[in-house]
Design a protein with these regions (language model features):
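C-terminal membrane-associated helical module and adjoining short loops/tails
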Residues: 1-22, 137-263
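Alpha-helical transmembrane segments of multi-pass integral membrane proteins
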Residues: 7, 34, 60-61, 89
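Membrane-interface helix starts
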Residues: 27-36
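Membrane-embedded alpha-helical segments that form the functional core of polytopic membrane enzymes
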Residues: 35-84, 99-104, 116-127, 180-183
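Helix-coil boundary and interhelical linker segments in multi-pass alpha-helical membrane proteins
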Residues: 46-57, 100-120, 160-176, 224-234
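Juxtamembrane helix-capping/reentrant segments at transmembrane boundaries
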Residues: 71, 75, 79-92, 141-147
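Alpha-helical transmembrane segments that form the membrane-embedded catalytic/substrate-binding core
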Residues: 85-101, 148-155
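Transmembrane-helix bundle segments that line or gate the permeation/cavity pathway
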Residues: 131-135
Length: 263
């Protein structure tokens, strides 16, 4: 799967690191083997119920993130890309995403109130919607240069880490709620950011994208309402929306400048 939006962290730190690592992989090992290995590791932790150990879950999320990036880079660098590889990669993203969400949810279940549980479930469905959209277009268009999927996974690693170091429930709740706010705003940005691209899509693609956007926006508005009702934090939304509008206008201006340069 190709990625449309990479972050500064990925481009400047992670990508060079992965390229060095893939050079040491024997060419008799295929990218699909790495993808399947990734699935088996996560599935093994899930079946054995070792995810109740915060350290095991933290390492599992790290391994998933590492191998998920590595198999794609290795496939491109070794020129072993294939349709089967894309299908396996897409399937892994959704299936492993479901497993990781479930394992995190079960690990923190005793410390989450009803509002937070609902918000996390809504964020999860929003992520699945974006993954399905990405499968249709054969690329990930999620995030921007300051925050992408890699940063989101790094944040998720810290959730079981807090549990492992036996921090107080209050601190765990503060971090989890903060993570909820970040993911909600991140998802709203992705929804709004894709709106200007609708006019460039072909006729068959528009119903899929419009349905995705409407569903996503509804999910995120409900999430933000629940969070605002719980913490009375409606006022940051206005500041955030201004920031989102600025990002979209700036991105559109850059695209227009690039078109002028090309012409």
């Amino acid at each position: 799967m190709s990625v449309a939006n990479h972050s500064l962290l990925y481009d400047n730190a992670l990508l060079p690191f992965y390229k060095k690592i893939q050079a040491y992989i024997p060419r008799c090992i295929t990218p699909n083997m790495i993808t399947i290995l990734n699935l088996l590791i996560v599935l093994g932790v899930f079946i054995s119920k070792q995810f109740y150990n915060p350290l095991v879950l933290m390492v599992t999320i790290f391994i998933y993130s590492f191998l998920d990036n590595l198999d794609g880079i290795y496939a491109r660098e070794s020129k072993q890309t294939s349709n089967l590889g894309e299908i396996l990669d897409h399937g892994n993203d959704i299936f492993i995403g479901i497993l990781i969400f479930y394992m995190l949810f079960m690990l923190l279940n005793g410390e989450l109130d009803t509002y937070t549980k609902i918000i996390l479930i809504l964020i999860f469905f929003n992520t699945i919607l974006f993954l399905l959209k990405d499968i249709y277009f054969h690329k990930i268009d999620y995030g921007f240069k300051y925050f992408s999927l890699d940063e989101a996974l790094i944040l998720l690693i810290f959730v079981p880490l807090l549990k492992y170091f036996n921090t107080t429930k209050q601190k765990n709740k503060l971090f989890t709620n903060g993570l909820c706010i970040i993911l909600i705003l991140f998802s709203i940005y992705n929804s709004i950011d894709f709106i200007p691209q609708i006019n460039t899509l072909d006729y068959d693609s528009k119903p899929i994208i419009i349905t995705n956007l409407i569903t996503t926006i509804v999910i995120m508005l409900v999430s933000y309402y629940l969070l605002a009702k719980k913490y009375s934090v409606i006022w940051p939304a206005f500041i955030y929306y201004l920031f989102v509008v600025y990002l979209i206008i700036n991105k559109q201006n850059n695209k227009n400048k690039n078109k002028l340069l090309i012409n």
